[in-house]
């Protein structure tokens, strides 16, 4: 009904579940409010769509530390500083338990992410796919930090992992990533750390939360004939 209101719906036919069901409202200038279930503003590798990965799967860092998808609200803003410098900020309050949870949440997740693009936007949203498919004519860089606090997490990784039957923990996650592209060359690096703030990572029933640290480094070079040499260290 209005170009200021958009929606996205994505259904996983294979597993029979809703992935995205979100409404996006551009309510003022560079401010947007999202409501529904969608990807959280977390590590950059998870934000890449499955069809836009550089390798056949995501890393072990993503497996254990991603915020994945969740249901709730997201407030997003972008700010231009000078001719090229772009700052994007994202805040989220979500149920903290991941995809398609029908029971009432026992505690919420609070997330903040800031993205700095000193050389301006990537070509055609190139910051959200891994390879330099657009062969950036000038260097492009994104530096980002994410903070998440999951209150009374009922799954091993907050939004991911097995359900917790015993005593729960509050989880604090910090993530940082960098993404660079220039003339076929691409690189991104990610760091993640998660701790349980109110007790050991192992609860009274011996259930283990996904805590600790991880590092993921990935890069490649796309030749002009569209063959690419790429690798990863995690």
PLM features: residue spans?
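Outer membrane beta-barrel
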Residues: 1-99, 103-120, 139-142, 211, ...
């Amino acid at each position: 009904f209005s170009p200021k209101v958009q929606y996205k719906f994505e259904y996983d036919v294979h597993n029979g579940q809703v992935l995205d069901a979100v409404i996006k409202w551009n309510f003022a200038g560079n401010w947007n409010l999202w409501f529904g279930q969608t990807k959280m503003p977390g590590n950059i590798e998870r934000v890449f769509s499955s069809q836009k990965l550089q390798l056949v799967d995501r890393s072990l860092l993503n497996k254990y530390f991603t915020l994945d998808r969740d249901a709730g609200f997201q407030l997003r803003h972008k700010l231009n500083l000078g001719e090229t410098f772009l700052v994007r900020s994202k805040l989220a309050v979500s149920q903290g338990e991941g995809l398609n949870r029908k029971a009432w949440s026992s505690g919420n997740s609070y997330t903040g992410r800031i993205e700095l693009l000193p050389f301006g936007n990537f070509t055609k949203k190139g910051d959200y796919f891994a390879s330099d498919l657009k062969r950036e004519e000038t260097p492009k860089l994104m530096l980002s930090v994410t903070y998440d606090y999951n209150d009374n997490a009922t799954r091993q990784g907050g939004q991911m992992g097995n359900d917790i039957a015993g005593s729960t923990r509050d989880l604090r996650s910090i993530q940082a990533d960098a993404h660079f592209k220039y003339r076929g060359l691409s690189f991104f690096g990610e760091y993640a750390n998660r701790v349980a703030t109110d007790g050991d990572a192992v609860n009274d029933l011996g259930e283990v939360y996904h805590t600790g640290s991880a590092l993921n480094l990935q890069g490649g070079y796309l030749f002009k004939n569209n063959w690419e040499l790429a690798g990863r260290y995690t």
